[in-house]
Swiss-Prot record:
NCBIfam families: PRK00132.1 (NF001099)
Region (Disordered): 104-137
Keyword 4Fe-4S: no
Organism, as annotated: Gloeothece citriformis (strain PCC 7424) (Cyanothece sp. (strain PCC 7424))
Any one GO BP annotation for this protein: translation
Biased composition (Basic residues): 118-137
Protein name: Small ribosomal subunit protein uS9
Gene3D superfamilies: 3.30.230.10
One Pfam family this sequence matches: Ribosomal_S9
GO molecular function: RNA binding; structural constituent of ribosome
A cellular component term, taken from the record's GO annotations: cytosolic small ribosomal subunit
Alphabetical UniProt keywords: Ribonucleoprotein, Ribosomal protein
SUPFAM superfamilies per UniProt: Ribosomal protein S5 domain 2-like
Amino acid sequence: MQATETKDRAVYWGTGRRKTSVARVRLIPGTGQVTVNGKPGDTYFNRIADYLQGIKAPLETLGLENEYDILVKAHGGGLTGQADAVKLGVARALCELAPENRQPLKSEGYLTRDPRAKERKKYGLHKARKAPQYSKR
């Protein structure tokens, strides 16, 4: 999560995680395009607008939605987990961009890592909490 110079352009890094998804996010000065694993964001997320809106939400909070391109390498989990991981990664990259961005992003909840994950299966049960059918006699 550091700023690096690439071809005379500043690149800001952020990593986000959600469930089993991990997203490594780069912010590059540009026009607001989202690229995930080499594909346009709307193609990767099957044109589900909520995912793209969520990804761009931290930028919109700061009024920077058309100033940075978002380049993402995401793996693990499903589309919802990856979209939330990207959102966290974008917010962390914006904190690298300027430390004063931290307070508005934190107050909106974009810097909070969602700790919920799948609960492990226990022996003697069918799933994490589903018990076999009880028979009184």
